[in-house]
Regions:
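Start-transfer (signal-anchor) and selected internal transmembrane alpha helices
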Residues: 1-42, 130, 224-231
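Membrane-interface transmembrane helices that cradle and orient dolichyl/undecaprenyl
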Residues: 164-178, 210-211
């Protein structure tokens, strides 16, 4: 009884590795045509510039960058996009890695594919089928355009996609705190992700009811209200 779960877990790791290798192979082909290699710096790097400005003690960028979409207030120039990706890049910029956006975009893309696979496995989809549909959702869709490119518009969309999948997965697993925290991070990348909240709450409600079928909504709130703390901190 103890051997089978271990074997299943190890098999899942192998399947996830296969999935990541497939995604990487498709990316490699795309990069040969686009030149968007993950070790290259990006011209449209608003989040890197924002992280650098924060480390220098400024909220504004210090000067104009005519090729970027910036907000102007009191003759100061600000990044006009939600800031969550800048928080992700901050520790890397701190150590001097000012081209980290490309590698972060690649890692986030792989993570999105992995969580697509994990969601499918939650519903007891056979592993090969789960890999196929995870690939179909990612490299088999227009997601590929945004995922293999780390420009400011695309990396935010890429992060929002992955974080939303993570929020869905943890909602299905009845881990409310993680689910809502990742959802809040997704909103910090793309504000329209807020529209997913009703669907997420429905998944959370169903997952809780599976474990506690007698609980009403007010009971769930009383038992799980502390799960709102991470989301509130992020917001």
């Amino acid at each position: 009884s103890t051997v089978k779960p271990l074997k299943t877990k190890n098999t899942d790791y192998i399947n996830i590795l296969v999935l990541c290798l497939c995604v990487t192979a498709v990316f490699f082909v795309a990069w040969t045509f686009t030149g968007q290699w993950p070790w290259k710096s990006q011209p449209y790097n608003s989040y890197i510039l924002q992280a650098q400005s924060w480390l220098e003690g400024r909220l504004d960028l210090g000067r104009d960058y005519p090729y970027l979409e910036l907000a102007i207030f009191n003759n100061k120039y600000y990044v006009s996009f939600p800031p969550f990706p800048s928080y992700v890049m901050l520790p890397f910029v701190l150590i001097g890695w000012n081209s980290c956006d490309s590698m972060i975009a690649f890692a986030v893309s792989l993570l999105g594919a992995v969580y697509a696979f994990k969601i499918l496995k939650h519903f007891d989809i056979e592993s090969k089928t789960a890999i196929f549909f995870a690939l179909l959702l990612t490299v088999g869709s227009n997601w590929l355009m945004t995922a293999q490119n780390a420009w400011v518009w695309f990396i935010a969309q890429n992060m929002a996609f992955t974080l939303s999948l993570m929020a869905i997965y943890y909602a299905l697993k009845n881990k409310i705190g993680l689910s809502l925290a990742f959802w809040a991070c997704a909103v910090g990348c793309r504000p329209f992700q807020i529209l997913y909240l009703p669907a997420l709450l429905y998944l959370i409600y169903n997952a809780h009811k599976t474990v506690n079928p007698e609980d009403k909504i007010i009971d769930i709130i009383k038992k799980r209200y502390l799960a709102l703390v991470p989301m509130a901190v992020i917001a």
